[in-house]
């Protein structure tokens, strides 16, 4: 932004990721609210009246975390579920039906099997937004929010002599293929010997660990991150869905 050049001996890339928006929804971006920054949150708060109605698209775990919070403070939430439902968890069809039932019991309205073909401004006297379904019909709400997974923010790294797949490829010590560059957080894929592939590790507990390990290794350490994952969606003692990705300690 400032067109500055800063030299470095070692670089940590922790640029994170932004919300992924499927191609079929991109033309409607101006009519949707994001949650990628503090400014986005302020705009969302301003757009939403008391006991307002939020329509969520997709249904990844970030969105569901917000959904349960909105319901808890008195708002109505309708989720138009897509293929990103419960992402990044991989949930089988039988378990998905069970988790959807629990989600509805938590107060979230879930719409299944509908393809969104348009988002429009509401007509006079109606809520501010209308989501239109293929084959007819739709739903009105005060705000529309897409939660369709994450896309690593790494375009600026092209040409930096690092290997890139969907994210920056790093070893378990979080070093890229460039000996001067490390990466941590949603921007990187870590080599997992257990899975014999590069994996993303989402959630605050993973990201916090990555930051600590990257700092240690950039100052001479050789610490490796644990690449074993047991991050399953589950139903807690209160009978609600819960996830390790919702751990913020």
Pin down the residues of each PLM region.
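Phosphate-coordination loops involved in phosphoryl transfer and adenosine-cofactor binding
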Residues: 1, 50-53, 113, 128
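A Rossmann-like FAD-binding core segment of flavoenzymes
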Residues: 6, 73-172, 222
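Glycine-rich dinucleotide-binding loop and its adjacent helix/turn
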Residues: 10-73, 170-172
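Redox-cofactor binding/interface segments in oxidoreductases and associated redox assembly factors
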Residues: 13-14, 56, 133, 146, ...
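FAD-site-proximal beta/loop scaffold in flavoenzymes
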Residues: 28-51, 138-213
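Mid-to-C-terminal Rossmann-like scaffold of FAD/NAD(P)H-dependent oxidoreductases
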Residues: 187-249
